Structures are given as C-alpha cells and as structure tokens.
Amino acid sequence: MRRSPKGSPGAVLDLQRRVDQAVSADHAELMTIAKDANTFFGAESVQDPYPLYERMRAAGSVHRIANSDFYAVCGWDAVNEAIGRPEDFSSNLTATMTYTAEGTAKPFEMDPLGGPTHVLATADDPAHAVHRKLVLRHLAAKRIRVMEQFTVQAADRLWVDGMQDGCIEWMGAMANRLPMMVVAELIGLPDPDIAQLVKWGYAATQLLEGLVENDQLVAAGVALMELSGYIFEQFDRAAADPRDNLLGELATACASGELDTLTAQVMMVTLFAAGGESTAALLGSAVWILATRPDIQQQVRANPELLGAFIEETLRYEPPFRGHYRHVRNATTLDGTELPADSHLLLLWGAANRDPAQFEAPGEFRLDRAGGKGHISFGKGAHFCVGAALARLEARIVLRLLLDRTSVIEAADVGGWLPSILVRRIERLELAVQ
C-alpha cells in the first residue's frame, strides 16, 4: 500500500488513530488505578509508592480508589486547592480507608462530622484555632530553647545506651524513643515509661493505617484504651495541682470552661500519636538516606551548613506521613472530578512533593534545591503542623550528634517500610559506624 503523503487526509487520519490509541491507553491506566485496590494497597506500592504516584499524576490529579468513597489527590495544585477550600473539605477524620481480605477498599468509620474527638489537625475552625492557641503557648521560642537543652541531653543518653560494638539499631535506640521523650517532657508527664508510650502511641496510628489484620486491630484498640486511661489519670492529677506545662495548661482551660475535658484528653492522645510518629519517621528517613547515599553523607559532613537543606529535602523526598484525609461536606468537584457529599479525600503529600510541575527533577535528592521549605510535608495554611519547629529542632540536634560522633555510617541492615497507607517510617535500621 502506498504511504499517504505528509499532510494528506490519510496522514491526518493515521495521526488521529495514534492519538486515540494513546488516549485510550491513558484512560485504561486511569481505570486500572481507580478500580484495583491491589494496585494502591499492594506490597510493591507500599514499599515504594512513587512510581504509582507518577502514573496517577500522568492520568489525572484525582482518582477514585476501588469504587469506594475515597479519592486520592496526587497533584500539587489539586492538593493545595483542597487545603484552601475548608468550606468544601473538612479536616474532620470521619473515616479512614482500609484494605479488606477480599481485595477491596472500605471505610473504617470514626467520629462523625463535627464530633467531639476531632482535635488539632482533624478539627475545623473555630475549635481548631482554640486547640492550636493552647498548644502554641508551649512551643514559643522561650519554651523551644528549654526543650533544646532537654533534647541534647536525651539524645546523648540514647546514643550511649544504644551503641554496642560499633553498631546501633537506629530506630529502636534513637528514632522511636527520642520524639516520645520530648512529647512527654512537653506535656509534663512525671517519670514516663518511654517504651510503653512508644507502644501506645504507635497503636493509636495503627488504627488508621489501612493494612491491619483483625487481630492487630483488636490489639491496637486495647493499647489505645490503655493510653487513654493513662492520659485520663495524668489529667486528673494535673487538674488537682496544675503545673507550668501543657498538661497544666489544658487542665486550667477545662476548669475555666475554655475547653471541655474530653477534647483536652484527646488532644494529649493525638500529641503522643502524631508528634512521636512524625518525628520518628523523619529521623529514620534522614539517617537511612545518609547511610545509603555516601555521596550525600560526605557533602553534609564537609559542609555542615547544608544540614538544614538536608533536613528539608528529606522532608520533601520522604514525608513522615503519606497523606491526610478530608471529608467532602457537600457534592462538589476538584480538578474536574465530581465528588459526592460525604465522600473522602486522601491528600497525598508524597505525590504532591514529587510533582514535576512544581519541582525540577523531583525524583532526585538535591541539597541545592531552591526553595527548600516549599514542600508540603507539614501541611499548609491554618493546619500547618503545630510541632514543625520542634520536629526540625530534634532532627538538627540528632543528626549533628550522629555526624559529630562518627566519621562514617553505613547501613548494615535495613528493614522494610511500615505497611501503612498513612505513615512512611522505616521499621528497622541497623547502622555500622566508625
């Protein structure tokens, strides 16, 4: 058959067929992502979600997951638009997405919209503003300086205790423990059992992780009840004798009617769960990068002033939380996708942070990246993470200690990432140090 000359009707039709095939392929990819829960919840995507995020972004910014009421939002602009529309998208955590044995996604129901357990990051204004104001009083510059002294001393003790024959299991010895020690000090707990608090705090987030077996769910529920009982006991003690700490501040706020007791107690549970979890994940990811990328480790050692840029790039590259949920108040649209009332968004920080429309070469770890704090790992706007400054402080102290006490760190054994669609934390990181 004679080939049609360039520009002839035959050539135009041939070009149109190729375009239609490409569009059809893209649509098929979109439908696969949207309908197959295994794609989103599977082990491959849990351990390395970024190739999936890239395919999702290429097909669209908003994806319905497995015919459920959950929509994943993966584009930078769409995520930011959702954050900026609180009148349409509530921060209340009314349900989380879970993976079933049948390979489908279903909701794990939480408190309904406007319920009393929505605090801090999961509260809407005006309640959110009240919660934030109470906590921020204890995260002011003066208090941060006191916490800095405590953190330096605590990190030193954990380092000495964790080092054995030139090795340290970083997550168990330092990353999981230090943030919980800092949270306990901030709240004002007397003689806390840190190992127990870590167990309880992680149990609280395990309920939300989406990949939990029934027996794990039951155990996590029991642990959360134990943590709640402990918090209630400490709160009663503080109410009888308020001290100059967050616990005393909350007790005083309840006595004055500014806050109800249940809300104050849930706020403390949330600080343990989210505050400990997020900083532990940051400390784990940062040291994993240093230990597995000797080129980056050498740059930071040779140029100590790069430590701040390293921390920010770590936050962009591996956000401590994969994302956060939003509740769709009324039927609306986001980036052209129709969203029914009472459906849910999962705003994927990790996907937004690697959107090539926002970041040059987003899959590369760069210490010279412009606009270092331009990532969205700590949220944005009214819900910008209340503990961001404290988390950065802990990271700076711990990483400075690690680099000052060693000449080389290597990863002797790296465990997998926590099976979770909410948290991005390495489970085990054995370091060999010189």
Curated annotation (Swiss-Prot):
GO molecular function: cholest-4-en-3-one 26-monooxygenase activity; heme binding; iron ion binding; steroid hydroxylase activity
Transferase among keywords: no
Residues holding substrate: 124, 128
Keywords: Heme, Iron, Metal-binding, Monooxygenase, Oxidoreductase
Keyword Iron: yes
Cofactor: heme
Regulation: Inhibited by azole drugs.
GO CC terms, sorted: peptidoglycan-based cell wall
Biological process annotations from GO: cholesterol catabolic process
PROSITE patterns the record matches: CYTOCHROME_P450
InterPro entries linked to this entry: Cyt_P450 (IPR001128), Cyt_P450_B (IPR002397), Cyt_P450_CS (IPR017972), Cyt_P450_sf (IPR036396)
Record note on disruption phenotype: Cells are more sensitive to azole inhibition.
Binding of heme, residues: 132, 326, 383, 385
Gene3D superfamilies the record matches: Cytochrome P450
EC number: 1.14.-.-
Assembly information from the UniProt record: Monomer.
Family: Belongs to the cytochrome P450 family.
The protein's name: Cytochrome P450 144
Gene name as annotated: cyp144
